[in-house]
Structures are given as structure tokens and as C-alpha cells.
Amino acid sequence: MAQLYFYYSAMNAGKSTALLQSSYNYQERGMRTLVFTAEIDNRHGVGIVSSRIGLSSPALLFNRQTSLFELLEKEHRTQPVDCVLIDECQFLTREQVNELSDVVDQLDIPVLCYGLRTDFRGDLFSGSHYLLAWADKLIELKTVCHCGRKANCVLRLDAQGNAVHEGEQVVIGGNESYVSVCRKHYKIALGLTRKESV
């Protein structure tokens, strides 16, 4: 029975690496996968899922207007699809997450979504919000803060390397713009810590 999976983490936890490995595992068994990535994420080229360790794969693009169920139903009728993998799933809309649940429930195709849970302000992305609510399986991929604790927050950095807490939710960037940290160091960087009482 197919399920909807949400693999989430802060940045640089190996989400794209895990996605590419999962796709390879299916393909190695002669199964067909379809890999998607967000149209707005062009850090490594358009229509490419790329990992920091050098793995990459061509990918179909989605944007806010893409009807994923319609596209996948058509693909599946043409040639059966064994697994759908979505990179940068935080950029999905509520309707697209609903459509992916229909791909699982009506077409019986497993859907594996990989993305960030929260933005640099600590707020959920739309796609992450609905995946946390509707996914059958939630899997946290872990990365490490500079202090050694689990990093579960993302800091956005300005051109001088200072943490910022204001601005557009989506600004595409890599290690020059974002760093994953633990909650304690997130609060320290943004000046959100409580003063110790004497």
C-alpha cells in the first residue's frame, strides 16, 4: 500500500542526497521514478536536483500552478510510475499536497517529499504545514549545529554575515545565505534570549 512521506530537516542535512539515493534504489530494480523540484530553485541549474556531495539528476519542474495529480495520472497511464519524489517540497501549495495524497490514495503510487520544515523566521512553509498534517510518515533528517547539538533552525545571513529576522520568506540561496543552527544559537544570533535574572 502506497504512502505519503515527508522527510524534513534544516538546511544541509542531506535531503537531496537521500532523495537521489531513494530514486536510484527504485531504478536499480527496474522501476520508474519521477523526480520533481521547485521551478524557483535554480541554484544548480533549472530542472536539476543536486546534492552537496556531487550527486545530481534531471527533474521535472513544479510551480504554484502545476496540477500534480493531472500530470502524474497522465504519466502513469502512458507508462506506470513506481515512485514520485519531490525535492524542495516546502514550496508546494495546500492544493498540491492534497493532490499528492490523491496520487497515493487513488493511483497507489508512493510519494516521497523532501524539504525544509521552517523558514528563517521559524514559521512553517505552506507545503511543510500540510505535509506535517497529512503525510502518512514523518521522518526527520538530522544535521548538526556548530556547537554539536542537533540543528533544527535556519538562520538567514545578510551580505556581512549577520543574522536577519525580516524579509521575504523565499530568497533562494545556499551556504552563503543560510546556516543551520540549534534553537539556542538561533535565539542568541537574533537577540531573542531572555535576560538571566540575578
UniProtKB/Swiss-Prot annotation:
This is Thymidine kinase. Its main location: cytoplasm. GO terms for cellular component: cytosol. The gene is tdk. Keywords: ATP-binding, Cytoplasm, DNA synthesis, Kinase, Metal-binding, Nucleotide-binding, Transferase, Zinc. Belongs to the thymidine kinase family. GO terms for biological process: DNA biosynthetic process; thymidine metabolic process. Its EC number is 2.7.1.21. It is found in: Cytoplasm. The active site is at E88 (proton acceptor).
